[in-house]
């Protein structure tokens, strides 16, 4: 009787699990279950190491250089990401040169605003004793923005407008255009330990208004590589431009440091959650 009771209880337990869970893989007498209503958070940086992932929903919204530093450089552990939200009156208007098949370059009106800053991993340094260490930092467009020299020059005009009129700046100076990514050096005296060098990246949103551009997105992306223009909502196309900020800093290694954000996940999130960084309307 006891064996029959145990068998019935076991079957009832399995039935309950199958009501709440689904089998996602099975083999070698092992079943891997997943809750039927399970929905991974889109805002997670990645799903590899849940404990060290920062939820984008918890990111702060800032509008100044100091606020970026406060939440990323000065905080322990630092937030790996913040939204940047400027009033619509601060948006910079510019002209973007886009190449069209059989038409050549055309000037397209765009509005530009910084929309986020994220902490980028640069390199790790094990330090023995107390030394003045020469370390790396990056300047220019990050290596995720690969485009033609004409497009980079056109994009740079809008960026320079933001640099001269907003309280969020890159800290670097350029002559005519923002350069492709370059490695620079800087030094800091460090005590013995394991250190990680990080540097913030500013992400700028370039907004093309007008639903009339929607049919041409594929063509614009084909002949203007690197922009990855996407159509969002009914009235605008957007592409994002990442530019390194001159603020490399070191952190002594600690287990509770957040993982760096994954750029592709970040860009998708920014596109789908414009209310986090876009005030709406035009200047």
Swiss-Prot record:
Transmembrane segments: none annotated. InterPro entries: BB_PF, SmlA. Its main location: cytoplasm. Coiled coil: none annotated. CDD domains: PFM_monalysin-like. It is found in: Cytoplasm. Pfam families: BB_PF (PF18063). It comes from the Eukaryota. Keywords: Cytoplasm. GO terms for cellular component: cytosol; phagocytic vesicle. Knockout of the gene for this protein causes small aggregate formation. May regulate the secretion or processing of a secreted factor that regulates aggregate size. This is Small aggregate formation protein. It comes from Dictyostelium discoideum (Social amoeba). The gene is smlA.
